Amino acid sequence: MQHGSLITVEYQTVNYVSGPLIFVERPKEISFGETAQIILPDGEARTGQILDISEDIAVVQVFEGTRGIDSHVTTVRFTGQSPLLDVSYDMLGRVLDGVGRPRDGGPEIIPEARLDIAGMPINPYSRDKPAEFIQTGISAIDALNTLVRGQKLPIFSGAGLPANQLAAQIAKQAKVLGEGENFAVVFAAMGITYKEASFFMKEFEESGALERVVFFLNLADDPTIERIATPRCALTAAEFLAYTHNLHVLVILTDMTNYCDALREISTAREEIPGRRGYPGYMYTDLATIYERAGRIKGCTGSITQIPILTMPDDDITHPVPDLTGYITEGQIVLSRDLFRKGINPPIDALPCLSRLMNLGIGPGKTREDHRNVADQLYASYAYGRDLRRLVAIVGEEALSELDRNYLKFADHFEKRFISQGNVERSIETTLQVAWELFSLLPDEELKRIKEEYIDKYRTLIISGG
């Protein structure tokens, strides 16, 4: 992230320091969102941004943290510019810190452009409808909650669930079907541990996926305030790759709960009136400025698809972070602790999951003609099997009919064979084939959500071993 201008204004009127914020008295001719350099007595320079301005006070957030800042001898230099990020096609394959500085020991990014990390608002009329299928290689997503190019589809996880493994698997495997497609991944990690960072680096390097990944890494011991800039820097890089170099970019943001906690910390330091669970009342608007930067633009070949990942505290889907995220985004993938305890990997709970744009990315010429019918039948059969499990807990399995026992068996096989796949990548054809193999547990007359022509065509192939 860069700053600077030929004309700058300096102040030595720092009033006091509170958390990641400093308060500067009597500022003049400065603007909201402007960057600042904080110069310490030993010459160390830190980067900040104006959060709030009143007649007498400017509130500046310091990205590197405020430790060591003495309000009496610290100089603040306002630059007259918004925070900028150096962007280049050569960012692919690089590991950067939360504000875009090299973290891999490599050279500085030689910029093709310097862009405002806040992005530019997109005219709604210029947006194009998401339409193309993105294959993640994960059956529970590809078949039941299809990811469409230009969509924002979050993953709701719980503490200790393998969300990081799922994120790494998606980053390695995601592709747009068809030859000649330029595809890249921008991966932004916020507040993760060294162990988690090492896991991601190892996964990307061993698979060779690092060559097409831009990695923004903010560790748990990095300044909390830096997390506010990390997703915006990542999306700025994604917009440059998508709209300048015509790449189809998948942006993975993890963990958005850490981002929101940083937002709460800043709000507390500013002594704002808290909202639900202490989060600021403007958190919905703030999250929207991140999530709404996904999509496609008419006349542009490139696109941005988002997968935000967040941790639900106490597995509570009504917590403000998943709750507000669900309002803004176009569906959700929910990880289940019960499935995780059963050894199902990935532990995706199909029933509360949703992809609102799924129908735009499936069907003939995109996936396969029977995709919608197969997904509907899988949902219906699995939901009935889950209901029967609760009934069995009361009356016992002996009270069930033979057909009901088949549905129980279907639910078990659905979890163990369809949902659970470990690190194995499945094509959409393989995923649909596994689904048809599961349907062999049920008689034809129970496949009420599938057209007869598809039953005749695909069930015959399974029976014949085709």
Swiss-Prot record:
Topology in membrane: Peripheral membrane protein
Protein location: Cell membrane
Keywords in alphabetical order: ATP synthesis, Cell membrane, Hydrogen ion transport, Ion transport, Membrane, Transport
Keyword Metal-binding in annotation: no
GO molecular function: ATP binding; proton-transporting ATP synthase activity, rotational mechanism
Any one GO BP annotation for this protein: proton motive force-driven plasma membrane ATP synthesis
Record-level GO cellular component terms: plasma membrane
Pfam family, one: ATP-synt_VA_C
Xref: InterPro entries: ATP-synt_VA_C, ATPase_F1/V1/A1_a/bsu_N, ATPase_F1/V1/A1_a/bsu_nucl-bd, P-loop_NTPase, V-ATPase_su_B/beta
Quaternary state and interactors: Has multiple subunits with at least A(3), B(3), C, D, E, F, H, I and proteolipid K(x).
Family stated for the protein in its record: Belongs to the ATPase alpha/beta chains family.
Function: Component of the A-type ATP synthase that produces ATP from ADP in the presence of a proton gradient across the membrane. The B chain is a regulatory subunit.
Name the UniProt record assigns to this protein: A-type ATP synthase subunit B 2
Species assigned in the record: Methanospirillum hungatei JF-1 (strain ATCC 27890 / DSM 864 / NBRC 100397 / JF-1)
Gene: atpB2
